[in-house]
Amino acid sequence: MSITGIDSSHVTESQGTLLFNEPLAEYTTWRVGGPAARLYKPANIDDLALFLSRLPFDEPLLWLGLGSNSLIRDGGFSGTVILTQGCLKEMTLLSDNCIRVEAGVSCASMARFSARNNLSGGEFWAGIPGTMGGALRMNAGCHGGETWQSVIEVQTINRRGEIRTRKPEEFEVAYRHVAGLGDEWFISAKLQLSPGNKETSLQLIKDLLAHRAKTQPTNEYNCGSVFRNPPGDFAARLIESCGLKGVSIGGAVVSEKHANFIINHQGTATAANIEALIHLVQTKVREQTSIELIREVHIIGDANVQTR
């Protein structure tokens, strides 16, 4: 079956939902991006495996959770998007201190689930605006916590729909980076946390979210942190020191509240505006400090808007 030959008959035996020419802006926290040629919402992991096994091997694939670490260009994505958020959403307490979580569970939900089960060490996930699949992929963290410090086992799936169980030692884990995944994607993980107190953990989450609201533009469309922190410094400090707070291109604006955030002001920005502002910030910081800011956000898709 060719890529262009994929149609609704492709999911005859599947339980999920296949959409065509689906606008992606509503699936990203920046609220920008053109359409996906196809978007699939799997019913569960087995359904996902079946769907992948029937895809043409050369079909371009994009995995999307909350879309908080992705800039999808205005031309969209000319392949198939696999949506995990709201789909792969199971959380299970396996033992007193071990949780199995699927890739589509939001990090905030995971933080609350662990706290309510009297486990500590996962409160920081409440401050990450993404899914656990994305957190595994980039070793997401904040407030002194990192995702992979709790991982004891992961499940991955490849484009043939084959599922593997893998251990942490099979990966190279670093700051906001995980190597060794190859042509696979995370679909679940077993996480080991420490015994704790529900009330203490829930209060910590409440305090963390209050701090986040005070220091980050949580009431504006954004993707989270745009750049990684360079060794020994902070991206936000460098951007602010270069006088870039409030700088804008179209509806894309460097946040006055936190310089490592670019906001889509009142939903008026295009992906092209945001991408241009990212490059401008990198250029100005490089020129003034000789430091190269590395993007944390992934830029995906076609730059040119196409008629489909």
Curated annotation (Swiss-Prot):
Keywords: Cell cycle, Cell division, Cell shape, Cell wall biogenesis/degradation, Cytoplasm, FAD, Flavoprotein, NADP, Oxidoreductase, Peptidoglycan synthesis. It holds the Pfam family MurB_C. Its cofactor is FAD. InterPro entries: FAD-bd_PCMH (IPR016166), FAD-bd_PCMH-like_sf (IPR036318), FAD-bd_PCMH_sub1 (IPR016167), FAD-bd_PCMH_sub2 (IPR016169), MurB (IPR003170), MurB_C (IPR011601), MurB_C_sf (IPR036635), Oxid_FAD_bind_N (IPR006094). GO terms for cellular component: cytosol. Signal peptide: none annotated. It is an enzyme of class 1 (oxidoreductase). Residues 32-196 form the FAD-binding PCMH-type domain. It is found in: Cytoplasm. Its EC number is 1.3.1.98. SUPFAM superfamilies: FAD-binding/transporter-associated domain-like, Uridine diphospho-N-Acetylenolpyruvylglucosamine reductase, MurB, C-terminal domain. The keyword Lyase does not apply. Disulfide bonds: none annotated. GO terms for molecular function: FAD binding; UDP-N-acetylmuramate dehydrogenase activity. One of its GO terms (biological process) is cell division. Pathway: Cell wall biogenesis; peptidoglycan biosynthesis. HAMAP family: MurB. Cell wall formation. NCBIfam families: murB (TIGR00179), PRK13905.1 (NF010480). This is UDP-N-acetylenolpyruvoylglucosamine reductase. It comes from Legionella pneumophila (strain Lens). The gene is murB.
